[in-house]
Amino acid sequence: MSHAAPLPDLPQYQSPMFIPRYQPFSGARWSLRHADMVLCPGYWTPPQLVNGMALLTRIDDSGKPHTWMSMSPMEIESQEIGCQHARGHVVVMGLGMGWAAANAALHPAVSQVTVVEFDPEVIAAVSQSGIFDQLPESARARVRVVQGDAYQYVPDTPADTLLADIWLPLFGAERDAEVRRMCANTGAGQVYFWGQEMVIAHRARQRGLA
């Protein structure tokens, strides 16, 4: 009689960043739900167990659902550098689950956070969970969400920091060109975009530097 192998003693993921509480949401194309226990690799760290992980999913034009974002170690670790180094007026391209905007607003060097989101249903999902209402008043007052196009948006006052995450895949070979366009529109002096380490490595390989 065979017996299942015991599960390895895996660490449970604990992020040093703020993790909002999410409420279930079901819209025409977007939904928010939770996974009870998931084994997830990190962006910088080995696999860890995550309990009650929130996921934002989107149904594509063929009717197939895709996980667009989640509170997984991969997602958090791949964006936390941008949040930790944000300053001044921060423009966040892509609301997602509101995580990056919330953590940027908590940074003492940040004075204002403007979030640009194209899809009103994503805005509704984050609003239903009251993500920014979970922040201290001083941080909550810094956040403003506007519906707009990340490639076209020009802020009323120039940005100091640009945080961009509007893509489904982690890597895009031409993503830096898209981000340069956003920088030109916003006037941002510093930028962090999702997957930028992979783009840097890709450019280095193209030039024979790696």
Regions found by a protein language model. Name each.
Residues 1-50:
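N-terminal auxiliary segments of SAM/dcSAM-dependent transferases
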